[in-house]
Regions:
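Conserved CoA-thioester-binding segment of acyl-CoA-metabolizing enzymes
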Residues: 1-57
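Hydrophobic/aromatic residues within transmembrane alpha-helices
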Residues: 17, 54, 66, 110-112
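A short, glycine- and basic residue-enriched loop/turn
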Residues: 22-25, 59, 64, 102, ...
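Hydrophobic alpha-helical membrane-association signature
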Residues: 32-35, 80, 110
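Glycine- (often His-adjacent) and acidic-residue-rich active-site loop
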Residues: 41, 48, 56-90, 103, ...
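CoA-thioester-processing core
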Residues: 84-90, 98, 104-142
Length: 142
């Protein structure tokens, strides 16, 4: 399947999902979440895949949720932040986060759910939602 907000590649026994919204710092919108969920399901179902690598295009791994969608989808977004981390945690295959820049909010939650994080010297991790009076939704502070 062709995706719009992620790049999903398989080579040999390795799958790579690249969050691909560099103009939005790879912020997670509804479409990106749905595409990621579908690709992760394919990774789980494909017996030839032995490991999954998650990364981001441009200057970010994932800069959290797309706050432009908060006004209409607050409860949906909160549920799906948890769900993305749960999807990563429940995969039966090892998941590596290759963090190449900003890894914030929901992106940090996704990375923390991985089995291994490899971070470049430019990687920056954080939970900026606390500055908005919002508790990190994916459980990263619990």
């Amino acid at each position: 399947m062709a995706y719009e907000n992620i790049i999903y590649e398989k080579q040999d026994n390795i799958a790579v999902i690249t969050f691909n919204r560099p103009e939005a710092m790879n912020a997670l919108n509804i479409k990106t979440r749905a595409e990621f969920t579908e690709a992760a399901r394919d990774v789980e179902d494909d017996d030839t895949i032995k490991v999954l690598i998650l990364t981001g295009s441009g200057k970010s791994f994932v800069a959290g949720s797309d706050i432009k969608e908060f006004h209409a989808t607050t409860s949906f977004m909160a549920h799906n932040i948890v769900r993305l981390g749960s999807i990563v945690e429940k995969l039966s295959k090892p998941v590596i986060a290759a963090v190449n820049g900003f890894c914030l909010g929901g992106g940090c939650e996704i990375a923390m759910a991985c089995d291994l994080i490899i971070a470049s010297e430019k990687a920056k991790f954080g939970q900026p939602e606390i500055n908005l009076g919002i508790i990190p939704g994916g459980g990263g502070t619990q």
